[in-house]
Amino acid sequence: MVRRDLLALGITIPSETLWRFLRMLAHQHGQLFNASALAVAMGGISPITVSRYLDIFCDALIVRKLEPYFVNLGKRLVKSPKVYFRDLGLLHALLNIGQAHDLQGHPMAGYSWEGLVINHLAAQMSQGFGGNASLYFYRTSAGAEMDAVIDTGSERIGFEIKLSDAPRVTKGFWNACDDLQLSRAYVVAPVEHAWPLSDKAQVLPFVSLKQVLSSH
């Protein structure tokens, strides 16, 4: 399927190179894209070539590139994008995760969950914000971090993503809330009901995400 999609776009990459790159990239899912590390793992090709491969898979809608949110805060911000596979079935296949029970306890389980939420946010944004919002992540060298930030132009909404039925947030979460002056912040987790963390932050079940987005 992937090979056919690329051929339809007029892109010809040797099959061995294609699958090797995707397998390597799968281990960066949900993490900062590191072109230099991938270049070494691919046998010494240039980071520029690795970045070009990533752009090809983004254009083919196989991979999503989430850019960092830049605001003039006088802080040192992370500048590399994060990468997510749009099809988690493909991601799991590349990671040799065959069944749901294989995912439990897997080192990539949390990143898989993060990808599920990010993909859902991206898909639902147009319904909740009239197509005018943009999706980013936020991270500073000092440790402030938010997995996803929706900027509508009139407000910013933050989302921290935790694969835990008893999620806890760190100081970095609260620092990000302050840095970005978020109107609301949610910790999206596999929980059955929501509960407040503050007057502007709450833990949110994944199943409630669509309703929350449509209310903004």
PLM region spans:
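Structural signal for conserved beta-strand scaffold positions within catalytic alpha/beta enzyme cores
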Residues: K65, F85, F137, E160, ...
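Domain-level recognition of nuclease-like catalytic cores that cleave nucleotide substrates
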Residues: V191-H216
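Active-site-adjacent loop/helix micro-motif of nuclease/hydrolase catalytic cores
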Residues: D165-F173
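Accessory nucleic acid-recognition modules appended to NTPase machines
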Residues: M1-S154
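Active-site ExK catalytic segment of metal-dependent nucleases
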Residues: E155-D165
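Conserved beta-strand segments of alpha/beta enzyme cores
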Residues: S134, R184, K200-Q202
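Short, hydrophobic beta-strand segments that form beta-sheet elements in well-ordered domains
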Residues: L182-A189
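Short, conserved loop/helix-junction motifs that constitute active-site signature segments
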Residues: C177-L180
